[in-house]
Amino acid sequence: MTSSMSPAPAPAYAQVMEDMEKGKELAAQLQGLLRDSPEAGRFVDQILHTFSRAMRALDKAAVSAAGGEGSEVQSEVTCGGGASAGGKRKAPAANRKANCRRRTQQSSGNTVVVKNLDDGQAWRKYGQKEIQNSKHPKAYFRCTHKYDQMCTAQRQVQRCDDDPASYRVTYIGEHTCRDPATAPIIAAHVIHQVAAGDDDDGCGGLHAGSRLISFVAAPAAPVDAAAAPTTSTITTVTAPGPLLQPLKVEGGIGSSDQEEVLSSLTPGSSAARGGGVAGPFGPDQGDVTSSLHWSYDAVAGMEFFKNDEVVFDLDDIMGLSF
């Protein structure tokens, strides 16, 4: 009875397709006649769209009906059957193919059966799912260092149905992360300043005030006390700067013929400090205003305060009147 009724759908399908094509052509002619009416044109567009959608659906149904039997047999061979020779599967062919694809994707990882889930890696659970025809759910884990070290390793854990004490673990991807607890410790060691050395400058090749920091994985060797009698515990790195040269001033300054003055004085000083050499100075050559800001002329200031009998009033110096 089935064989006598099987050719029937072919003429019916052809008749339906012919009628749909004719209706579509008539709607197109109507669209040409109603071109000047925007409202009528919109209705005709909807009619044409409906015809086109119905024809596509009819084509898809005909292809599914023609290849349904062959698809069912191929699905039974590929995925493993469970249906009898005289019966058919209740699930659609599309669902069976999707199930086969899911099984193939799940088996792409490395699956092991273990008693203990501790594998020495850091995992974070991000989901759990009930599995069809299984007594226990499946848990999904990702590496803890997914976001800070971009590690894409994953694992799926499910308790075995036949042995509840065992777990079926599927590993997907490889660990590219590094545990911070086992990473080598980088220590910063300060090379102490050497007070005396064998170099010509007497500083062991280092400028005054310079510091060097080296980053090594091993502990630093102990510093010999004899080689470095003077050490510094300041760990701030300072760039070596120019050495300060003494300024020699010649002329009558008390009983001393020469006096060394640092050259890093304020710009408000006299030409003697800028030039480096000056003649004798008298008390009237002292810059009183600059002396209030500690930028007075060194030579004149020393000559001025040399006389113990000098008495001055602070108000007179400031030039203030109350």
Swiss-Prot record:
User: What broad class describes the main subcellular location of this protein?
Assistant: nucleus
Q: What highest taxon heads this organism's lineage?
A: Eukaryota
Induction: what does the entry report? Induced by abscisic acid in aleurone cells. Induced by salicylic acid (SA) and infection with the rice blast fungus Magnaporthe oryzae. Induced by cold stress. Down-regulated by drought stress.
Quote the SMART domains the UniProt record gives: WRKY (SM00774)
Biological process per Gene Ontology, one example term: negative regulation of response to water deprivation
How is expression of this protein distributed across tissues? Answer: Expressed in aleurone cells.
Q: Gene Ontology cellular component? A: nucleus
| Pfam families reported in the protein's UniProt record | WRKY (PF03106)
Name the DNA-binding segment ranges: 112-180
Disordered: where is this region?
A: 67-110, 256-284
Q: What happens when the gene is disrupted?
A: Enhanced susceptibility to the bacterial blight Xanthomonas oryzae pv oryzae (Xoo) and the bacterial streak Xanthomonas oryzae pv oryzicola (Xoc).
The molecular function terms of the Gene Ontology recorded here are: DNA-binding transcription factor activity; sequence-specific DNA binding
Q: Which controlled-vocabulary keywords does the entry list? A: Activator, DNA-binding, Nucleus, Plant defense, Stress response, Transcription, Transcription regulation
As for subcellular location, the record says:
Nucleus
Q: Which family does it belong to?
A: Belongs to the WRKY group III family.
Q: What does this protein do?
A: Transcriptional activator involved in defense responses against pathogens. Acts as a positive regulator of defense responses against the rice blast fungus Magnaporthe oryzae. Acts as a positive regulator of defense responses against the bacterial blight Xanthomonas oryzae pv oryzae (Xoo) and the bacterial streak Xanthomonas oryzae pv oryzicola (Xoc). Acts as a positive regulator of abscisic acid (ABA) signaling that suppresses growth of seedlings. Acts as a negative regulator of salt stress response. Acts as a negative regulator of cold stress response.
Query: What's the protein here called?
Result: Transcription factor WRKY45-2
| Source organism | Oryza sativa subsp. indica (Rice)
The organism's lineage is: Eukaryota, Viridiplantae, Streptophyta, Embryophyta, Tracheophyta
This protein's encoding gene: WRKY45-2
